[in-house]
Amino acid sequence: MVDRPVIQYVVEEGLASGADEVVIVNSRDKKSIEKHFSPDTELVATLRARGKDAYADEVERVGNLNVSYVYQDEPLGLGHAIHCAAEKTADEPFFVLLGDVIVPDNNICPRMLEVSRAHGGASVIAVLPVPDEQVHRFGIIDGAPVEGENGVWKVNSLVEKPALEDAPSNLSVFGRYLLSARVMELLADAKPTVGGEIQLTDALDAVLAEEEMYAVVISDEDGFDTGTVETWLDTNNKLYARKNG
């Protein structure tokens, strides 16, 4: 994405949020991701010998980011992938950052953490307003604005890809979550549902019956989608303009 892999944006966002460690849920055959975040003394030495110290510094920095890995041996859904990292979260709240969206200014997770702390450690999700014609493509929240808290909603329920006439709002789940430890417990007992997969949405619905959940409304200037060819190209253009404007 312009000058770095999408996964690097996501890792750097996670570390900038104050997380102690970024855990990548990987498949065992995707060694290129692990290589990217591993020290490469040979490449660093070659770059320095050629007078490319700035590039060498960047390779060195990326190779020393605090990243670890767990493996999802079967593609059993997002909920299953998250639970693969259960031992890493150690019964504590945790962020989930999906790799098909990026937040170049690293400004969403700190806001989510602030809202969670203001509401007793509640789970918080990021949501993005979408046009009516796109509502059916996303998970949509049902809820209401919190009085006195600009851009914060209390979530009542989540509706997965509703028809426009059934949508309770136009606020789509964006791919940034700050989740309580209870969500991980629920994922441990979750059964496959749609498509034979373990869905995160099911665990979020279950936790809503026990705990409060809030949403932080973001704008399309805060986060960018890379999940389709069209959005990938659009995001590249926007980021290039930002860097060279």
Report the location of each language-model feature.
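Conserved N-terminal catalytic core of the sugar/cofactor nucleotidyltransferase
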Residues: 4-93, 103-107
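Short, surface-exposed amphipathic charged segments that create phosphate/polyanion-binding patches used
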Residues: 83-86, 138-143, 173-174, 230-234
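Active-site acidic Asp-centered loop
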Residues: 97-99
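Conserved core of the sugar-phosphate nucleotidyltransferase
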Residues: 103-185, 190, 194
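Conserved alpha/beta core of the MobA/IspD/sugar-nucleotide pyrophosphorylase nucleotidyltransferase superfamily
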Residues: 151-154, 168-245
